[in-house]
């Protein structure tokens, strides 16, 4: 770093504080010819905002193989975390290059980064995520430069590994996760009440079919295939493939998420339309194939009846003006459905069934805080954990996680939610809703 900045009339400490590392998004042409934003870690003169040095450190943000699976926002977040660390080195130490960092340097940075500038602690999940981003970066930087640079830390010091025995496959599974460095994360964890109790989904889908039929298929894809909200709106009609076996019997449904939707390429709108977090081919879980297939047929017929195009490159989900639905519109409509239709119906049916006391805590929690459209993907995970009896590796595949660690972290962090899902249930009875229909606004 000091090799880049040479101004002898000032002390080195003063000089270093006049510069800052920032992420600069640059447009590159991808293999498919599309223009995409890619992070670039650049050293700037702070006052003038003039780029001084293009570091090329963005090469170490993630593995090349993983790079194809990460969207621009994730890469941007990784670059931000690395810039935060580089600025700490630049302003708070006299280290001249990354390989001079010691484990104490890294630990001191993580310790100092627990609090924001206003002294408020970072959210625990945010801090852990950025710690992992930094760890990945430092491990990769060491891996690809250890033969040419005299490092004062090693990649192994930043990682812990344990070997577990999978009782079903009878194979050993290696779990690798960031070292704690004897640092506790901030105590500010605030978990959203994202649990959708077993049976609630049936009621929500019922209400959606009546009042929001245009997003019902999207809800089902989140709950029955684990799609994220941004992935739902990225689906074209050609991306949903029906798999058939003998006599035309449907044996599977596969959603092609290997590329961004054609109708979002070259997007010029003011807001982000939604993105695919992990590019993949995602199958609907076997227990729900026929339910999703029926909803897809109904959705397609409804679109065609209103003269919306249903060609292979056309959007499955459109807004009320007939344009491709953005993730913002989709999530807003899910939220409106949740509060205007689902929650009143849940309240009324529980009273009629005499089960309100059992569900009052969930209803109160929903009224206090919206669980978010991501609740459908959580429901999918809960189902796989409690009803399907799959191993964590199998659940990881169905969820579309990029690593085993992500799945294991999810199980550990949501242990209470998993227990509640196992122990609580709601029986959806359509006839009760019909009988009290006038009471549900």
Regions from the PLM with identified roles:
Residues 198-229:
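Basic, Lys/Arg- and aromatic-enriched nucleic-acid-binding interface segment
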Residues 144-149, 220-252, 393:
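Short, charged phosphate-coordinating catalytic segments
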Residues 399-424:
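Catalytic-site neighborhood detector that most strongly recognizes the C-terminal catalytic loop/helix
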Residues 57-168:
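N-terminal core-binding DNA-recognition domain of tyrosine recombinases/integrases
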Residues 331-394:
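Short, basic (Lys/Arg/His-rich) helix/loop patches that form interaction surfaces
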Residues 425-441:
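C-terminal secondary-structure termini that scaffold catalytic or DNA-interacting sites
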Residues 235-295, 305-312:
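Conserved tyrosine-mediated DNA breakage-rejoining catalytic core shared by Y-recombinases
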Residues 278-337, 343-355:
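Major-groove DNA-contacting interfaces characterized by cationic-aromatic clusters
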